[in-house]
From Swiss-Prot:
Site-annotated residues for Important for catalytic activity: 222
UniProt-listed InterPro entries: A_deaminase, A_deaminase_dom, Ado/ade_deaminase, Metal_Hydrolase
GO MF terms, alphabetically ordered: 2'-deoxyadenosine deaminase activity; adenosine deaminase activity; zinc ion binding
CC terms in the record's Gene Ontology section: cytosol
EC number: 3.5.4.4
Protein name: Adenosine deaminase
Organism domain of life: Bacteria
Any one GO BP annotation for this protein: adenosine catabolic process
Function, in words: Catalyzes the hydrolytic deamination of adenosine and 2-deoxyadenosine.
SUPFAM superfamilies xref list: Metallo-dependent hydrolases
Binding positions (Zn(2+)): 15, 17, 199, 279
Sorted UniProt keywords: Hydrolase, Metal-binding, Nucleotide metabolism, Zinc
Amino acid sequence: METKDLKKLAKAELHCHLDGSLSLDTIRQLAALAQVDVPQDDSELKQLVTAPETCESLMDYLKTFDVIRPLLQTPQALTLAAYDVVKQAALENVIYIEIRFAPELSMDQGLTATQVVEAVLKGLEQGQKEFGIVAKAIVCGMRQSSLDISREIFANVLEWANKGLVGFDFAGNELDFPPAVLADLIKETQAYGLPFTLHAGECGCPNYIVDAIDLGIKRLGHVTAIHNQKDLLAKFIANDVTAELCFTSNLQTKAARTVEDFPYMQLRQAGAKLSINTDNRTVSDTNLTKEYELFVKHFETSVTDFLEHNRDAIKASFASPAEKEALLDRLDKAYQSYIKK
């Protein structure tokens, strides 16, 4: 398929980080509000906020976020940022998106976690009204932070449950802070009733995927370490888990050292449920259309495959049953003309 056709395809995205996905124009706008100097030249600014094509590691990749953190410290900034990412998604025919963020990273200047979530939800709501997209929020804890900080944040933001906030996650340094370290807090938080997704297997540790599945988590981000792990793949499928794949990001961070190391083909051939995602649109210099192009190029992914992956994404989403039903209907209708070709 040509790029213009891939762009027209209806899409769903489950794994997109707010702070890693801001457009250059919005970064400039936020920098002006925060009175932070950033380059006016696009190429210079892009170099500042985009990770190298090949990083030394995940932690090397995550350094890029340090530039954005000071820009997301006010309600106005967070609302603008959320609206910006929804707009970017809608312009490439994303009909459903879950945008994740860590309130902790926007509390440097006195905002509470509740205020951070409220501001993000306001931006999502503006984007939904303007573009006809469904956009939800996932709150992340930071693995390397004190568990007490994450515990307090998760408890405090519950007032936004099912008002746009639909789930929780842990992001950050997976290697040193595996699921076992987080297990008790994850179980506590699951008791609140909102679902969990979890970054798992991004750092090359298959056992972390096992641990996440054993915690009853039904959506896992990246899962690159599942590659060539037949027993783990069988467990993944038996437990009805959906993979949130992030191809460009995984090559950058060396989670997958080569295209051949990326687990998509093994997941697809085994019948596992999966979704295609950007992870960080700006930090990885990508969007969903670019990701789809890469899947066509490297894996010969077909329109029928894309429909199936998007159906998997919507079914595994944290949207309400009624929203899922409407989104699946919208998705199927959008693909009819392409499937017939």
